[in-house]
């Protein structure tokens, strides 16, 4: 991974992020899965300096590797991604209303961890 430059510093922040549908429902299959896979890289339209490097859509969760500049909180970026994707899915697939009766499609939390150097590399 390369070092990126911002106005007043340099950074190398890479995050592994996982989130799940509410109630861990197995909705991410078929056409919905394909639609989600197409939409995940679109975050760069809203935040050009956030990079989606890798993603994997499983039947009941989503994995992503993101490069997020230090000026953004990981939680705000993930929250916006979940909100935008939820809105698009509910508009395109009205049958989701049978499974999710409110405006909420995703579980409220998410998992994130940093990706990068391990302890052995740092000691060297």
Feature-to-residue mapping (PLM):
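Basic nucleic-acid-binding interfaces
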Residues: 1-124
């Amino acid at each position: 991974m390369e070092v990126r430059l911002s106005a007043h510093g340099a950074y190398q922040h890479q995050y592994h992020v996982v989130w799940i549908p509410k109630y861990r429902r197995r909705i991410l299959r078929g056409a919905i899965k394909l639609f989600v896979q197409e939409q995940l890289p679109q975050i760069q339209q809203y935040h050009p300096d956030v990079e989606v490097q890798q993603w994997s859509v499983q039947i009941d969760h989503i994995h992503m590797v993101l490069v997020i500049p230090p000026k953004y909180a990981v939680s705000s970026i993930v929250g916006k991604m979940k909100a935008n994707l939820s809105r698009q899915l509910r508009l395109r697939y009205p049958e989701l209303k049978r499974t999710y009766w409110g405006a909420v499609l995703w579980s409220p939390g998410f998992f994130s961890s940093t990706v990068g150097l391990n302890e052995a590399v740092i000691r060297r």
